[in-house]
C-alpha cells in the first residue's frame, strides 16, 4: 500500500494503525440508503489498558475509492484484509523521513492521521463531539476531547453568530 494511500485513508476514517491492519470485508456494511460504513470493534491493547469499543464510521468518497483500488490486490485476497499495510514501525520511519525532508518539526507518526480526522476532517466541519467520539470508537466524549483542539476560526465563527443574534 503506498504510504500516501494509507495516510489519506487514516485521515478520512480516523482508524488507528492496528484497526486498519485488521480491517476486513466483514467490517464494511452498506446501509439501506446505499451508503457504506466501517463498523469495527477496536483492537484491545492489554498493555495500554485500552478498552474494547466499536467504531462506526460513514465512509466518504476518498476512503471508498482507496478501498476499491485495493479490493483485488493479491495480499488482500490472500489475507482477507481490505488494505495491504506494512508494519507500523516502517510506516513511521517513512513519515519521519518525509517530515525531515519538508522541514516539519512535529513528530509525524501514523497516529497523527487519527488526530487529523478528529480535528480537521470532523470537528472543523462542525461534526458534533459526540458523533466524532462514536466514529473514533471512544468510550466517552472525555476521551475525544483529547483530540479536539479548539481552533480560533471556529471560536470566531461561534462568537460572530452570537453577535448577530444579540444585535438590535
Model-derived regions, located:
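Basic, Lys/Arg- and aromatic-enriched nucleic-acid-binding interface segment
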Residues: 1-17, 21, 125
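Short, basic (Lys/Arg/His-rich) helix/loop patches that form interaction surfaces
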Residues: 13, 74-81, 85, 93-134
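Conserved tyrosine-mediated DNA breakage-rejoining catalytic core shared by Y-recombinases
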Residues: 22-68
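Catalytic cores of nucleotide-enabled group-transfer and carboxylate-activating enzymes in metabolic
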Residues: 33-38, 120, 131, 144
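Catalytic-site neighborhood detector that most strongly recognizes the C-terminal catalytic loop/helix
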Residues: 42-44, 88, 123, 136-161
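C-terminal secondary-structure termini that scaffold catalytic or DNA-interacting sites
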Residues: 61, 73-77, 162-168
Amino acid at each position: 500500500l503506498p504510504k500516501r494511500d494509507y495516510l489519506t485513508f487514516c485521515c478520512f476514517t480516523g482508524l488507528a494503525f492496528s484497526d486498519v491492519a485488521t480491517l476486513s470485508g466483514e467490517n464494511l456494511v452498506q446501509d439501506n440508503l446505499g451508503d457504506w460504513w466501517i463498523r469495527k470493534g477496536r483492537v484491545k491493547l492489554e498493555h495500554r489498558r485500552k478498552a474494547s469499543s466499536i467504531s462506526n464510521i460513514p465512509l466518504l468518497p476518498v476512503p471508498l475509492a482507496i478501498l476499491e483500488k485495493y479490493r483485488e490486490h493479491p495480499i488482500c485476497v490472500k489475507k482477507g484484509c481490505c488494505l495491504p499495510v506494512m508494519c507500523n514501525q516502517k510506516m513511521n520511519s517513512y513519515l519521519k523521513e518525509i517530515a525531515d525532508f519538508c522541514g516539519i518539526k512535529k513528530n509525524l507518526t501514523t497516529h497523527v492521521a487519527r488526530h487529523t480526522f478528529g480535528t480537521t476532517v470532523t470537528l472543523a466541519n462542525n461534526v458534533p463531539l459526540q458523533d466524532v467520539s462514536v466514529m473514533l470508537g471512544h468510550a466517552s466524549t472525555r476521551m475525544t476531547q483529547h483530540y479536539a483542539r479548539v481552533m480560533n476560526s471556529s471560536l470566531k465563527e461561534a462568537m460572530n453568530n452570537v453577535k448577530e443574534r444579540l444585535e438590535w
